[in-house]
Amino acid sequence: MHIQPKNSPDKLRRNAAAFLEDDEHVQALTYATNSLVAGRGANFAIVATERNIYVIVAHMVGLGTRLHKVNNKFPLSGATAKRSDGGIWINDFCLKELPRWREETAAFVDYVVGAAQKASSRREVTGVA
């Protein structure tokens, strides 16, 4: 029998779906903090869908995570993302990358960068901004 940790990516993905618009699906996600010190600051689930990026406030509960509310939502089409020096930059704000979520963070950044490149290519082909 396989037991998932309470704050596993699969569980976070299922819980995050409740905060999305009805016709959206989780394409990539990660978990990060705005704190430089463990136990301080706020934690966030960052979810990319087909159209939007959601930054959802997360509370640590026991050994798991409870998602609380959408802190920020912005269109994926104009978004930027990159990793740098233990952090993840999304547009103009930076969150601290958590070591346990490195693979998911890399996949999230790749998804956002790929989506931005596709949107840019469509604008060049169609001439529509």
What feature does the model see in each segment?
Residues 1-45:
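Anionic N-terminal interaction surfaces
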Residues 16, 28, 51, 105-108:
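Generic intrinsically disordered, low-complexity segments enriched for polar/acidic and small residues
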Residues 22, 31-87, 92-101:
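Phosphoinositide-binding peripheral membrane targeting modules
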Residues 104-129:
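Terminal and domain-flanking low-complexity segments
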